[in-house]
UniProtKB/Swiss-Prot annotation:
Organism lineage: Eukaryota, Fungi, Dikarya, Ascomycota, Saccharomycotina
Biased amino acid composition, Basic and acidic residues: 64-75, 334-348
Keyword annotations: Mitochondrion, Transit peptide
Family matches, as InterPro entries: AIM23
Keyword Electron transport attributed: no
Predominant localisation class: mitochondrion
Family from the record: Belongs to the AIM23 family.
Ranges for region Disordered: 64-91, 334-370
Protein name per its UniProtKB record: Altered inheritance of mitochondria protein 23, mitochondrial
GO cellular component: mitochondrion
Top-level taxon of origin: Eukaryota
Range of the transit peptide: 1-26
Cell compartments where the protein resides: Mitochondrion
The keyword Mitochondrion appears for this protein: yes
Length: 382
């Protein structure tokens, strides 16, 4: 520690990032203040340098942490945003279709109609025809279906005209609903077989197309100028009545036999015969009849007989042509009142049932009287 005549004493103090250094420089040759005994030299106090010791803790108060309470708060945070109002949504109504009547096929058919309606209206709202009020009535399909008796009635769907409108529901007979359902299934199956390349399906389709063309073709009934009066009044008369009873449009062609083939071939073409409307055909004055030949008189007689047949039946017709070559009747049967016929048939059935019940009652009364007579005779004999 001491060398020569010069000595240096150093005293250092460190506390909390502060360093204090005090150096004392003694005067030269001032050895009086120094202790010559090495054994009696003072030890350095290291505890005084401990900033976090007990002495420092007791000497200087510790400042409180002003952020401690901020993070130790247990109260909920304040939300300055306004509270959202909870919207109470109405629960969706369960759609339940109930089929308590009808066969399994009828139930499958009405399920197909329900699926078709759902493809147009997801809410099952429809315009209903047949409520008795007249016009369209907006209803729910569940109310219509659940009120149906599938053993008697069915429904069918009419697609809407645009995306904003609702489908139309009409009632029909359950047999018609089942038939449309089975036809739809058959068509889907046929398309599936055609895609697979089935030869049988191709033959069936071709035969059906031929049948449809034949059905849609205009029917032609021919009458020859050389027909006898008996054949005209019997055979041709029944043929014409059958055509009228079917209610289909048909042509009645009067001409030579050799022109029948061309008449049938050109019947489907519009104005193929090239005949002008001549409603005055057959209106011949009596003074002109004397100058007519036998053939012309025969043709006039055939024409008048056919015209009388059409007049007596419920049929409208237009005449074109002339007696010299050919005459064409374009016939359109009138629509019959089917309701009146149905009511007549029902009334006839009711009258038959009433008469049968009366006969049964009369027979019972007669039997009871005979039994009483036999009892009385038995008692008299006793």
């Amino acid at each position: 520690m001491l060398r020569g005549s010069r000595s240096v004493g150093v005293y250092a103090v460190c506390s909390c990032r502060q360093f204090t250094c005090v150096s004392a420089r003694l005067k030269p040759f001032d050895l009086g203040s120094l202790k010559t005994n090495n054994n009696q030299s003072e030890t350095f106090n290291f505890e005084s340098m401990n900033r976090f010791g007990d002495s420092s803790a007791t000497s200087r108060p510790i400042k409180e942490n002003r952020f401690a309470q901020k993070f130790e708060k247990s109260a909920p945070k304040k939300n300055n945003y306004p509270k959202r109002q909870e919207k109470h949504r109405n629960p969706r109504k369960a759609v339940r279709f109930q089929f308590e009547s009808g066969s399994v096929q009828a139930q499958n058919a009405i399920k197909a109609v329900i699926n078709e309606v759902h493809s147009y209206s997801k809410s099952y709202k429809v315009n209903y025809v047949g409520s008795g009020k007249g016009g369209l009535e907006q209803k729910h399909l569940v109310d219509i279906v659940n009120s149906l008796d599938l053993a008697v009635n069915g429904i069918y769907c009419v697609p809407p005209t645009d995306d904003k409108s609702l489908p139309i529901i009409k009632t029909n007979k359950v047999q018609e609903m089942i038939k449309s359902y089975t036809d739809k299934l058959a068509l889907e199956k046929e398309q599936e077989l055609l895609q697979k390349g089935s030869i049988v399906a191709q033959k069936v389709m071709r035969s059906r197309d031929r049948a449809e063309k034949k059905k849609s073709a205009t029917k032609v009934s021919t009458v020859s100028w050389g027909i006898s009066n008996s054949d005209l009044c019997n055979q041709k008369a029944t043929e014409i009545q059958k055509r009228i009873s079917k209610g289909e449009h048909f042509l009645l062609y009067l001409g030579e036999k050799k022109s029948f083939y061309s008449a049938r071939q050109s019947a489907s073409k519009e104005n193929a015969f090239g005949l002008k409307d001549t409603p005055e055909v057959g209106d011949i004055a009596e003074e002109d009849l004397a100058g007519m030949s036998v053939e012309e008189r025969k043709r006039l007689s055939i024409f008048q007989t056919v015209k009388t047949m059409l007049d007596d039946s419920s049929c409208q017709y237009e005449i074109s042509g002339d007696l010299e070559s050919r005459v064409l009747f374009s016939c359109q049967p009138l629509e019959r009142d089917t309701k009146s016929k149905d009511t007549e048939q029902k009334e006839a059935k009711k009258s038959k049932k009433a008469s049968a019940s009366k006969q049964a009652d009369n027979s019972k009364k007669a039997m009871s009287e005979d039994e009483l007579d036999s009892l009385y005779s038995f008692k008299i004999e006793d």
